[in-house]
Amino acid sequence: MIPLRSKVTTVGRNAAGARALWRATGTKENEFGKPIVAIVNSYTQFVPGHVHLKNVGDIVADAVRAAGGVPKEFNTIAVDDGIAMGHGGMLYSLPSREIIADSVEYMVNAHTADAMVCISNCDKITPGMLNAAMRLNIPVVFVSGGPMEAGKAVVVDGVAHAPTDLITAISASANDGVDDAGLLAVEQSACPTCGSCSGMFTANSMNCLTEALGLSLPGNGSTLATHSARRALFEKAGETVVKLCERYYGQEDESALPRSIATKKAFENAMALDMAMGGSTNTILHILAAAQEGEVDFDLADIDALSKRVPCLSKVAPNSDYHMEDVHRAGGIPAILGELNRGGLLNKDVHSVFSDDLESWLDEWDIRSGKASEEAIDLFHAAPGGIRTTEAFSTDNRWDSLDTDAENGCIHSIEHAHTADGGLVVLRGNIAPDGAVIKSAGIDEELWTFTGPARVVESQEEAVSVILNKTIQAGEVLVVRYEGPSGGPGMQEMLHPTAFLKGSGLGKKCALLTDGRFSGGSSGLSIGHVSPEAAHGGVIGLIEDGDIITIDIHNRVLDLGVSDEELERRRAAEEASDKPWQPKNRQRVVSKALRAYAKMATSADKGAVRQID
């Protein structure tokens, strides 16, 4: 047997003081010596994806206790990227991932917890907890708060907006054809319930990827926050983590640990899923970071290779009118993985927190397998309630039928793929020798080749001003630099610029290029993660107005039409300037906390993780 980590605080004379304190938290005599399971919650009233989680920890705790564990709950912080968007608050979003990971490590190691159930949901919370799980390598199960229901259709000035979501509201705000009353109607419909925003944005993308990594249960990524079916996921998470404890501590079975589950092959499967479902570009940052935390040899080159052979099987908002509730009706993540598996695109020799092998759990949970269990079929009938609410488990609505249309439905078969390439593409060239990323699933294929003159700005705020003041012209490439992990600092999301371009009618007429990043809600020719970033001496810092930029998604090229000699001349001039590799006219207050992150942050090709050594 492997001794419980918590034994140092619960067993023996030397632990008398710690036991006295444990008793003061409600620990009973017969609980000493049992595995302590940290219920890592993230409840907050600031974030709709987390507002319903206050009592969810109790559900998990009851299940842990019934299975023979000792539950102890704590909370992490949670930043709402949508509320933080478009102002200085967005500087804090990506760095909060590191704070969350550190806080989980601090709490779990300081109190010698034996295992964790991570109750996450929104953009940086799942990645932060995932980084912590890979770092700590103790038994863990992830269970998210679940996606929000899509908003109901609204008609504004004769134009239907159906169904609505956060991106609909932001785009409408920049559309001169939508008056204030129309905008109010859209925003009142856009976010009707608790849960992570309803499209295949960053939060839902990451929660889906935990299924493919093997660290969460089937349905985790797609079962609505409001549906009663989600309660069972929390209960099963509590039961499952205690079983993992028994396997690891009681049977010395290291296959129960996250690093044994989320191996390189599992990371490859997760990114194959990401390509197939057209996930957020932010997932690349977070998957690279998690791999580094778990000492998994998985990098941008691996992602590039996968994107060349895995097709895009599903287009979900912001790239279509489908939302997560539609993905769920089509069989959720098991259905997408099942299609990939039948196409020979998954590694089969992987296991999960609930199953010993991929084939058996896909047989049971893929509604297209012909062998799906009644439990699986029942789960994927869970439908939205259509009632505004902040309460979890508040609806029992059911779909009349499942979406099994592999040609025209929400999830296509490989034979009917949207594109032969994956929904995420890595571009390289003299602008981004270390890579840049674009969500190709959000772009009409006729726009996959684009050439235009650069319009250079040095902040997101300036980019928004250029768009809303209508000084950007069709055919231009808007270059937003010094917004990378170090240069921002914090690598702001450019949701407002992309949404405002779309709302201004330029979404298919301009490109946007940045060393920052994009929201999962961004679409169009939005190229982010340019590496090296400007603050690290990247070529993006040398681009001048009027320089010709070529984007070729088919050939994965991002090129600046400037000679090497001219770039060297510009580089020499930049390095001889008073403030080399810094924005020249930007007014931005940067706090001590953000400056600390900036000093350690790597460029996006490394996951924007902190480099300490």
UniProtKB/Swiss-Prot annotation:
Q: Which PANTHER family match?
A: D-XYLONATE DEHYDRATASE, D-XYLONATE DEHYDRATASE YAGF-RELATED
Modified residue N6-carboxylysine is at which positions? K124
- UniProt-listed Pfam families: ILV_EDD_C, ILVD_EDD_N
Catalysed transformations (reactions):
(2R)-2,3-dihydroxy-3-methylbutanoate = 3-methyl-2-oxobutanoate + H2O; (2R,3R)-2,3-dihydroxy-3-methylpentanoate = (S)-3-methyl-2-oxopentanoate + H2O
Which named protein is this?
A: Dihydroxy-acid dehydratase 1
Q: What is its EC number?
A: 4.2.1.9
**Residues the record lists as binding [2Fe-2S] cluster:** C122, C197
Q: How does it assemble?
A: Homodimer.
This protein's UniProt keywords? 2Fe-2S, Amino-acid biosynthesis, Branched-chain amino acid biosynthesis, Iron, Iron-sulfur, Lyase, Magnesium, Metal-binding
Quote the InterPro entries the UniProt record gives.
Dihydro-acid_dehy_C, DihydroxyA_deHydtase, DiOHA_6PGluconate_deHydtase_CS, ILV_EDD_C, ILV_EDD_N, IlvD/EDD_N
Query: Which residues, by range, are in coiled-coil regions?
Result: none
Q: Which GO terms describe its molecular function?
A: 2 iron, 2 sulfur cluster binding; dihydroxy-acid dehydratase activity; magnesium ion binding
Whose protein is this, by species?
Answer: Corynebacterium efficiens (strain DSM 44549 / YS-314 / AJ 12310 / JCM 11189 / NBRC 100395)
